[in-house]
C-alpha cells in the first residue's frame, strides 16, 4: 500500500475517486493526517459536548453509509434505507473515543448482527478475524499518535 503523508497526496487520491480513509488495500495514511481529515469532515468527537457530538456522529454515520456497500458484512443481507443502527463500531466509542470517527472502526451490520457484535459471542462471527486485525492496526497507529 502507498503511504499518504500530506494533504496534497490525499486530495490527489480523492480527485481520482479513491478514498484513502477506507481503501486499505491500496493506501495507508499517516495517523496525524487521518485524524486531521476526520476532524474536518466530522468534527471533534473527543472534545465536543452534547449536541456537537450528536451532530458529528450523524455526519460520520451518513458519510460511512454513503461510502460503504449497503449490505450486512456478516450475513451479506442487503440493507435498504439508511439507519445509524447499521453502523457498528468495532471498538466502542466510550472506550476508544479517539477512534469514534475512524471509518475503519465501522462494520455495516444488520440489526441482528450489530446486536451479536455488541452482546453476543464475537468469536463465532465471520467478521471476527478481520476485525481483530483492524483492532491491532488501529491501536498501534493511535498509540503512535500519542507519542508525537
Residue ranges and their predicted role:
Residues 130-148:
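Charged phosphate-binding loop/patch that engages nucleotide di/tri-phosphates or the phosphate backbone
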Residues 11, 70, 108:
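Cys/His-enriched microdomains
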Residues 76-108:
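Histidine-centered nuclease catalytic patch
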Residues 17, 23-74, 97-100:
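Short, charged surface segments at domain edges that flank catalytic/cofactor-binding sites
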Residues 80, 106-129:
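Short Cys/His-centered divalent metal-binding micro-motifs
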Residues 73-76, 112:
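Short, cysteine/histidine-rich loop/knuckle motifs that typically chelate Zn2+
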